[in-house]
Amino acid sequence: MQIHSTHVCFGGQLSYASHDSTATSCEMRFSIFLPPQATVEKRPVLWWLSGLTCTEDNFTSKAGAYRLAAELGLIIVAPDTSPRGDKVPDDEAYDMGQGAGFYLDATQSPWSKHFRMYSYITAELPALIAAEFPVNPDAQGIAGHSMGGHGAITIGLKNPEMYKSVSALSPIVNPLDCPWGQKAFSAYLGEDKASWAEYDACELMQAAGDRSTYPAILIDQGDADAFLEEQLKPQNFVKACEAVGQQVNLRMQPGYDHGFFFVSTFIEDHLRHHAAVLC
């Protein structure tokens, strides 16, 4: 692992780092915020997954999360959204290839060698962070925005013993039923719809059995989001949650769109949501 830069931030420490990944067969980058409390004890960690076209820097520089994270004592890790590099396959479209990893393990050529973001996020990166930084592995939460909201919910549902709290802003919750998901899943996973269901929040929730004892999932969604009706469809997820007893708090926010002004407005609510479970 290489630390590229470190900055004092609200009494804590924000670092940008990279390492050679075996999961994605390329260099991967991430940012990590350590609150002041991490100098004396292991602290809970919140994994933040960003959306289409983003890198590790978008949330880090735009969300305004670190003042409250320092107060609450939350470590925040923000990885890149995909493998990158000259040898990594790409696509001219913004919603495929580099910057559009969709937090799955691709099975189709030419994507399968590098696009293994599910394994990277759930296994390799947590092991690295636990070895190098003062995280409490028994207190982990996961959150994200848009494509990252899809990643946060699906990863949280598939690994409930690891991620104790889940939240999302403007998440893609039903990729089997939206153009972004259908395009990406066709390319990365092929035409076997059963494999698609493994990365669809609605499908996973419906198959989860009784979820009545799990903490509530917080979702914020702007009602002026240009992608709301065609791509995001949060009501589909609410119905899936109701069917298995999962508490979900979907908050429709009047006038807000899909961007980081929206994220920065509500990020503190999400940090408090996770801290209530983890801290």
What does each model-found stretch correspond to?
Residues 1-279:
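Non-catalytic cap/lid and distal C-terminal segments of serine-dependent acyl enzymes
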